[in-house]
């Protein structure tokens, strides 16, 4: 939780709860390709709010988890991308790895046949767990 929220929680009987906003395929939410003017205005408002949360949210205990197949500058604006503290990438070519992690580690450290394997911006490689639907 952000420093300001922690300080607030130490001085009140009703602490702020963490809020986590998760969006899988954020590209679907922000892509302006082929959008008419009305839709572009709506998307600009959404982008503006996400940008504000990315910049200031941690101080209030609000966190973003945004996922997309290809987070290029046309989909996730730099203002949002630069304020995302933690990045994770699966197997990717060097261009995509550079976009996500600012390095080519996803290309170099994740084998092509490794399914469910990811690397963090700090270079930590980890394996995701495969859930069998019968187990759920």
Place the predicted regions along the sequence by residue.
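N-terminal, helix-rich and Lys/Arg-enriched segments in bacterial and organellar proteins
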Residues: 18, 34-37, 49-52, 63, ...
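Alpha-helix capping/termination and helix-coil
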Residues: 1, 5, 30-33, 61, ...
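Conserved ATP-driven motor cores of ASCE-family P-loop NTPases powering translocation/secretion/packaging/pilus
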Residues: 54, 60-136
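Conserved structured core elements
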Residues: 20, 44-47, 51, 74, ...
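Flexible beta-alpha connector loops of hexameric P-loop NTPases
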Residues: 28-47
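Switch/coupling sub-region of P-loop NTPases
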Residues: 1-3, 39, 43, 52-56, ...
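Mechanochemical coupling/switch segment within NTP-driven translocation systems
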Residues: 1-20
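Walker B catalytic acidic pair
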Residues: 24-26
């Amino acid at each position: 939780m952000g420093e300001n929220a922690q300080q607030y929680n130490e001085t009140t009987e009703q602490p702020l709860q963490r809020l986590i906003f998760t969006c899988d395929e954020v590209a679907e939410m922000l892509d302006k390709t082929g959008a008419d003017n009305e839709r572009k205005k709506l998307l600009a408002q959404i982008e503006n709010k996400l940008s504000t949360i990315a910049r200031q949210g941690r101080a209030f205990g609000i966190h973003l988890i945004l996922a997309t197949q290809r987070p290029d500058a046309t989909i996730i604006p730099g203002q949002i991308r630069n304020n995302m503290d933690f990045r994770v990438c699966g197997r990717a070519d060097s261009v995509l790895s550079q976009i996500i992690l600012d390095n080519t580690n996803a290309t170099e450290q994740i084998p092509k046949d490794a399914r469910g394997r990811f690397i963090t911006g700090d270079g930590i490689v980890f394996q995701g767990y495969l859930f069998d639907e019968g187990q759920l």
